[in-house]
């Protein structure tokens, strides 16, 4: 097949009902080519992230019980209703951690930069479809043709997907993957003993009256209803000096070094005053308000709502300092400090991805090369502490886009291990 014929094959095999509501993307004739080194890193990363999630769970529980670092649990519980905090601490779920792990990795020359760790991700059905479709074209996609389908079924074990109205745009991909009879609206769902995949955010829970009245801890549900595990604050806590020995003990020295390599330096935007002789590490400032006068170069930072907010997923609630005027940046810093007690923010070094090239079929049926920056999203499935890489979704956006997410002018494709695609 010619490249155009391959792209048409992919387009023509899209499910009639689609995979997302009112969303389209550019179609590539071939998968995105990752270097062997990047592909090898993806194979190693899953178990380390699982150990990190397990360590986060342990740290929170130790903190909540007053056994260690008592400041951690109140920080992670900020803004959450007492009943949800109580559910997340229940003994029947104390050891549970997410069975699906999807990091958002910005592709760089040497490795990746981890911008987020998602345990309730979209894209599972889409990536399964991409893997199957490109495999039919003879491509050796990472995870294999059925890696996503088998991986998701392994953690679902014949169960159902519970999807909220807020996440309804992703319903078609789940119905394609499992069949409409296994995708249920959580707003009118009553637990029936079957395992369930939670495709709704924890902040939706207080509005889900029927589910909240009937669901009990111990009923199989992944990701577990532990909103503290879904906070972006963990990326800042990973860098916290008082916690370094804890991380080394729980994820091992090699795991700690790997995460130090890929997690951009991050801070908790806590307005508590510092002693006069102290400064904020890496930034060299004595107060967060000093950031308001940062130059554009100094504002090469990303400010994010940590979690438990309708603005904490996707590109919502994310502000790239160098893209904003001094006045806009100053306003966001002030809002972040004012809302700390209810909606803590995390501040990260901005990770600028390396440039990569990929062809796609334009609307006029010409094959066009897009030069852009890539977000690489591997999907890991965890069963009995065994971690499997099911597949990889790559989103390539034009180089002028600072935030990488699914958009009309992005290429969405699976990944293969091949020669480097960077320039």
Regions found by a protein language model. Name each.
Residues 1-423:
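Preference for protein termini
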